Amino acid sequence: MPNTNDTQPTNERTRAQVTTARTVAEAARKTGEKVQSRIIIVENLADTSLVIDQAGDPNTVVEPSAEALSAAALSPIMQRLAALEATPTPAATVAEQVQASARLNRLADHAGITTRAIGIGWEDTSNAARRNWSEIARAAVTRGYNTIDLAAGRPEWTLFQWPAHPEWVSLEPQENPLRDVIATLRANGIEKIYLTLDMMVSTSLAKFPEWKAISRDGTIRNMPSPAALTRSPIRDMLAGAVAQVAAQFGDIIDGIIITELFWDSGSFSDNDLLLYRSDTGAPDWPRSEDGALQETPEYREWLTTKMADFIAHCRSLTAGVPLVMDVRVNWNQPLAGRPDSGHDYAKLLRVADEIQPWVYYDTGEESKAIALVYALNKQWPGRVRPALGLWSATPASVGKALAGLATAHRVQVTPYSKMGTLLR
């Protein structure tokens, strides 16, 4: 049914869609070229005394095989999900790319290369002209930071030009502040730059409420549902933004970070149910004897697969630019991830280059944060980039955590606006 609330002329919308499609197609074409160059870099760095891809190495990217699992040990729904995961998709190429990236990270670790990153939020990047980026870079380098992560906005209000969707751009037509900021940061000693893309699309979800996630308790969330990640317009909007960032900045950045993409106690919308039925063959959601919705292992397997499938799609559009996925943490069982949020770490690491766990702890709980980071690093060496948050922890507390993580190869501190004494 046509959306009668949309005032954009059909021909303009069609032209915009064609432009977006061309951007996506160009990103896909470049993927093959860029991944080959990255693989060559890895091969040139290879140390013959270092064995990376040993059998059983947790860092090796291996797609699950339905044949390798005993059919008798799986329920019919799990058998169908396993077959769905094993179906050839563009993710096969993505898996090859992230495996090459993982090997490069392990080689960097072996060489003693570390990443100490600062997350700079929208509050600063949206006011780029009012910030002294040379001074920001010099202060960061002086305190041992070598990487800056810059907020690039959300698909609905971007800090980058998007010709297909000028209505979503928060800039004047000739402005390109992020490119200027990146040049200044690099000129003043910052070695690596990442752009962070927030996946919240509140305005679009208000326009298309049928694509909102609905938690197990019935709460309607301002987040895209699993089904929304498989269908237009939400899927195209989110993935299109990733493709646009890669196309516009891929030559000058080291990666793209996807943030704010998760669910709370799953998602059980009507559109989700249609998708669940199609994927699993089940007639309804899992329920208890009294009819209450349940997050069974089969359900969480489905939920996390939908998230990983979407991230694989995004990664396939980056033209070889590494993709980092922000994830929630499980304090009680760190390696279990957060399947209720759609975050199965092992699945995500088949299609994303790294995960960035939100290690947002309270002051006084530094040891808990340190233990979690080392547990994740041990399981997935070279693939974990923890973010220490300053929302509930003081700069002094995060300083203690950083000292305890001295041997960790990758750590981010966020946000810059709250770092205070950490930069003095």
Residue ranges and their predicted role:
Residues 194-198, 255-264, 293-340, 382-393:
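Aromatic-lined carbohydrate-recognition surfaces of secreted/lumenal glycan-active proteins
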Residues 136-137, 154-203, 298-318:
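Aromatic-lined substrate-binding rim segments of carbohydrate-active enzymes
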Residues 351-370, 380-424:
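Substrate-binding cleft of secreted/luminal carbohydrate-active enzymes
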Residues 114-127, 194-247:
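Active-site-adjacent "subsite" loops/lids of carbohydrate-active enzymes
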Residues 266, 323-364:
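Substrate-binding cleft/loops of secretory-pathway carbohydrate-active enzymes
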Residues 131-157, 251-255, 348-354, 405-411:
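Catalytic domains of carbohydrate-active enzymes, especially glycoside hydrolases
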Residues 149, 177-219, 256-264:
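Glycine-rich, aromatic-flanked loop segments that form ligand/cofactor-binding clefts
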Residues 155-178, 204-229, 268-301:
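Aromatic- and acidic-residue-enriched carbohydrate-binding clefts of CAZyme catalytic domains
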